[in-house]
């Protein structure tokens, strides 16, 4: 059964008015399996400022609703859409267009040690 990890929304978050993330997850054999809900307008870059604005760990995943733009440190971008399987190496951030008609929802797999450490830092940036 998936368990809530944390939720960040406008009342918790200092970064942007439309920052709305819900995350559920579970540990399986040293891997974290997390389901993310990113509302339209979500930009995770401000939450990654401790890491230079880019996520320091790789993720594997599947997008089952909506779409998101993944931006890499080298300036390249790719759009992940519903039905896409993806791999995001370390050095990425993501943005959901504020005019998107639906939220972006993904399931993502990450090394538990890396994921837990990174998510703890990001969660500390949320308002209490």
Language-model regions, residue ranges each:
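Short acidic, glycine-rich loop/turn motifs
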Residues: 28, 72-74, 98
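Short acidic-glycine-tyrosine-enriched beta hairpin
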Residues: 74-91
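A short, N-terminal "cap"/entry segment at the start of jelly-roll beta-barrel domains
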Residues: 1-37, 42-45, 50-52, 124-128
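Short, conserved beta-strand element in jelly-roll/cupin
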Residues: 53-70
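Ligand-binding loop in jelly-roll beta-barrel domains
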Residues: 89-120
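A short, polar/proline- and glycine-enriched secondary-structure boundary/capping micro-motif
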Residues: 45-47, 81-82, 116-120
